[in-house]
Amino acid sequence: MKLSFLSLALAIIFVTVLIYAPQAEAKALADAVADADADADAAADAVADALADADAFKIPWGKIKDFVTGGIKEVAKG
């Protein structure tokens, strides 16, 4: 008797999955498109903010390069 209840429960789950899978897939695709649009907007905003911040703050690339190359030379010695 337990086997028949288990079979019935599995059959109900299987049928439910078959019925609702296309709806869930369509919703997931629509959500993915909306998420991609939102991510693109967020990325564009982040780039614009980074460029604005870079203009406002002058980065001493020469000093950074000297620091990094000096560290690499010390590691190579050691």
UniProtKB/Swiss-Prot annotation:
Task: Kindly give the Pfam families that the UniProt entry links to this protein.
Answer: Pilosulin (PF17499)
Tissue-level expression? Expressed by the venom gland.
| Residue ranges annotated as propeptide in the record | 27-56
Keywords assigned by UniProt, alphabetized:
Amidation, Antimicrobial, Secreted, Signal, Toxin
Q: Which residues carry this modification: Lysine amide?
A: K77
Do you know which InterPro entries this protein is assigned to? Pilosulin
User: Quick one: signal sequence residues?
Assistant: 1-26
One GO cellular-component annotation of the UniProt record comes to:
extracellular region
Q: Disulphide bridges in this chain?
A: none
Q: Which GO terms describe its molecular function?
A: toxin activity
Instruction: State the protein's purpose.
Output: Peptide with toxicity towards insects that may also act as antimicrobial peptide. Causes calcium influx in F11 cells (EC(50)=5.8 nM), possibly by modulating sodium channels (Nav). In vivo, is lethal to insects, but does not show toxicity to vertebrates. Intraplantar injection into mice does not induce spontaneous nocifensive behaviors up to a dose of 200 pmol.
Q: What is this protein called?
A: Myrmicitoxin-Ta2a
UniProt source species: Tetramorium africanum (Fierce ant)
The beginning of the lineage is: Eukaryota, Metazoa, Ecdysozoa, Arthropoda, Hexapoda
